[in-house]
Amino acid sequence: MAEVLSIDELRERIDVIDNQLVRLLNVRVACAVEIGKLKHELGMPVYQPEREKKVLEKVKQSAQQLAGPLTADAVVRIFERIIDEARRAERESGSTSEDFGPLIGE
C-alpha cells in the first residue's frame, strides 16, 4: 500500500524541490551568460532565434516523453520565460552587444 503523506510533508517535499530548481536555474543562467560573453568576443549575435527554437523543441519533446501532469505547451511556456530571464541576465552582466533579441514574456 502506498504511503499517504500529510500536507506538511508534501509541502516540505515541494520546498526541497524548489531549492533544487533555483540552484539549477542559476547554474543554467550562469552558463548562458558565459556563452553570451564568448559570443561577444567572437563577434556573434547574442540572440540566435534558431537555437532558441531548437531548445524549445527539445524541451517540448522531453515533456511529451515524460508525460507528467504539465502539458508540453506549459513546459514550453516555462522555458520561454527561463530564456527571457537568461537574456536579461546577459544584458545586466555588462555585455555591450545590442542584439539580445525580443523578450518573449513582455
Residue ranges and their predicted role:
Residues 1-106:
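Domain-level signature for soluble enzymes in the chorismate/prephenate branch of the shikimate pathway
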